[in-house]
Design a protein with these regions (language model features):
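Short glycine-/small-residue-rich Rossmann-like dinucleotide-binding loops
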Residues: 121
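S-adenosyl-L-methionine-dependent DNA methyltransferase catalytic core
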Residues: 1-75, 180-184, 206-234
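The conserved SAM/SAH-binding core of class I Rossmann-like methyltransferase domains
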Residues: 79
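Conserved SAM-binding strand-loop segment of SAM-dependent methyltransferases
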Residues: 94-101
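Class I S-adenosyl-L-methionine
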Residues: 105-115, 125-234
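Conserved SAM-binding loop
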Residues: 89-90
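Conserved SAM/SAH-binding beta-strand->alpha-helix loop
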Residues: 82
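Hydrophobic "anchor" residues on beta-strands that sit immediately upstream
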Residues: 46, 76, 97, 115, ...
Length: 234
């Protein structure tokens, strides 16, 4: 999650998000790729689901991108299992009903939606862990996402993970992920982005994988914002 520092405020050990930031975060700019002029959307509501939702940073960026395009948005389904994350998420989005373990919910029970957001567990691909990939139960959660995309056939998705996913198993893991998504008739693009390039006071690289049924997202053109240490101290 590459959330801008000016869009968060502290709450105990964790963070609560707020929508006052005027700087476009990575999530916002990625989400804007969905909304091309040629695409048709019901302005009454762009529906999306938020899986492995964490504190809600990806949702925040998506909702702000909708606002930029003059679109209303509605989160119709949220899934998260960690109690502390659920507590903070509800502080950010008070009207949200949080569903538990997504592996225990049949795709047919998920409401119809236009876009899927998912920061699926990164430990199996992180350089800080054992990097067991799909052999790790958490790594296999990608296939849960795949099952949902196959069953619900939304217009697009935005997936986030650690940058180590790109090099895991000499790049073969990412190739499998891209291939499986393309098999579902999505046009897919990916890129590694650094939080420091979006006005955030830390170097934090993440891989973003974005897919759309109607066009190939452009993940190479971003408005990058760098801030000095002095600006952050102020």
């Amino acid at each position: 999650m590459l959330t801008n520092k000016s869009a968060i405020k502290s709450t105990d050990e964790y963070k609560v998000l707020n929508t006052d930031s005027t700087t476009l975060t990575a999530e916002q700019q990625l989400a804007l790729n969905f909304f091309r002029p040629s695409a048709s959307y019901d302005k009454s509501s762009v529906k999306f689901i938020d899986l492995f939702a964490g504190l809600g940073g990806t949702r925040l960026g998506f909702e702000q991108a909708c606002i930029e395009k003059g679109l209303n948005s509605e989160c119709v389904f949220t899934s998260e299992i960690k109690d502390y994350a659920i507590s903070v998420y509800k502080s950010n989005f008070a009207d949200s009903d949080i569903n538990g373990d997504i592996t225990q919910i049949a795709p047919e029970l998920i409401p119809d939606f236009d876009f899927l957001l998912a920061g699926f567990p990164c430990q199996p691909f992180s350089s800080a862990g054992k990097r067991n990939g799909f052999l790790d139960e958490r790594g296999g959660l990608f296939f849960t996402i795949l099952d949902i995309l196959d069953a619900k056939k939304p217009k697009g998705f935005l997936l986030e993970n650690v940058d180590g996913l790109a090099s895991h198993n000499y790049g073969e893991t990412l190739k499998i992920i891209i291939s499986k998504l393309q098999d579902l008739d999505y046009q897919v693009a990916w890129n590694i982005l650094d939080a420091s390039e979006f006005g955030v006071p830390q170097k934090r690289k993440r891989i973003y994988i974005v897919g759309h049924k109607e066009h190939t997202p452009n993940l190479n053109e971003f408005t990058k914002t760098f801030k000095t240490v002095h600006e952050f101290i102020e």
